[in-house]
């Protein structure tokens, strides 16, 4: 059986999702504070949070244009992805962070993502290990709480697809606060 090699990560972008949406790479940053469409940020967040797999066009359309009477949601998606790529160009230059592949889009596996949500979740999991000393656990909880800058993607909190994730991270936050008390 032939194994496919893991792609080599060329660059790693730091992504903040807790308390706001920001990307930082090589000292250049981009955040949702700039005046852009919320759908643009939402589609970008969806791609990053689902970076482990190609996302079919149909999934994007069901998620972002469910009852939209748009005459051509496929074209609307392509236009939006073009705008996202243009917005990301100052960060990535020639490296394309978003790839198209057989009716789907995916986050380029050569672009690593360091997400605050992943670090937050990992710290909470480590802190819940009862085999650790109380002091070590409290240090881990403090580190986790310092990462939690607010709810997940607060400007996009009306998005149905985000609600379960937001509830999960907020629940972890409340558990960490309670454990620290």
Residue ranges of predicted features:
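Short boundary/linker motifs that mark transitions into or out of structured domains
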Residues: 1-43, 95-105, 150
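Short amphipathic alpha-helical recognition elements used for nucleic-acid or partner binding
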Residues: 31-64, 84
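Intrinsically disordered, charged and Pro/Gly-enriched terminal/linker segments
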Residues: 32-33, 49, 69-73, 93, ...
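Positively charged, aromatic-enriched patches within helix-turn-helix-type DNA-binding elements
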Residues: 23, 50-77, 159
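DNA-recognition element of transcription regulators
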Residues: 36-45, 70-91
């Amino acid at each position: 059986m032939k194994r496919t090699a893991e792609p080599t990560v060329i660059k790693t972008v730091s992504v903040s999702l807790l308390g706001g949406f920001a990307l930082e790479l090589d000292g250049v940053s981009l955040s949702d504070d700039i005046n852009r469409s919320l759908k643009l940020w939402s589609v970008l967040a969806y791609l990053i949070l689902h970076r482990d797999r190609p996302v079919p066009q149909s999934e994007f359309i069901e998620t972002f244009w469910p009852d939209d009477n748009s005459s051509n949601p496929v074209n609307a998606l392509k236009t939006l992805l073009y705008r996202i790529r243009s917005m990301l160009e100052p960060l990535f230059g020639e490296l394309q962070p978003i790839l198209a592949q057989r009716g789907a889009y995916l986050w380029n596996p050569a672009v690593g993502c360091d997400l605050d949500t992943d670090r937050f979740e990992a710290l909470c999991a480590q802190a819940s290990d009862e085999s650790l000393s109380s002091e070590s656990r409290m240090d881990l909880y403090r580190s986790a709480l310092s990462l939690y800058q607010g709810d997940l993607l607060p400007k996009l909190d009306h998005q149905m697809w985000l609600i379960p994730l937001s509830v999960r991270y907020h629940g972890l936050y409340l558990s960490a606060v309670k454990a620290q008390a």
